[in-house]
Amino acid sequence: MARHVVLLRGINIGSRNRVAMPALRDALEEASFTDVQTYLQSGNIVVESRAKPETVRKKVEQLIEQRFGLEIAVVVRTRAELAAVVKRNPHAKVATNPKAYQVTFLEQKLSAKTVRELEQAAAGAERVVVSGREVYAWHPQTIARSKLWAKLAGKDLGVTATSRNWTTVEALVELAGGLGAFLAAGDLVPPPPPRSRAPSASASRTLAG
């Protein structure tokens, strides 16, 4: 059976959208998912299923609504896709603090207009790379006051999206089987050409293809 990484958007933030992980694990197992594991309280789940990723997404969304009465958006990646996200790592040379390095997982690719808006929002030493259905964003100063982060965390992207810091991304790869197994098996999917926004001498940012 295939292993999937299931990412929930916006749960357990303060008193809003509360979902207990033990109860969620039980519900997923009752729904015929196997080897169900969770990481932290922010909605990071690894499951095994014969279903395709899109079917897994719909099934988890429906289950959460039925069991917990919440409409929660879900993004799913196969374990090979998530391992490819880590292997790609376009900010490896500059992102020294994993808590300030965010990956935004998208249900679908962004429009060219939205990509340009993200690139224009990167300020100072911030960097952003859009690669397929992921956005890699490095916020070296502060995430809280970042216009780039505000765009990524908001609802103006035009697609379902949810973000995780680099520590969580790497932990989920390990939980799903580890990067070494994928490299040995040649199981990684080829990365799409990235579009990036990085600082330049003239305007603090430059577009790198």
Q: What are these language model-derived features?
A:
Residues 2-209:
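Surface-exposed, charge/polar-rich loops and edge strands
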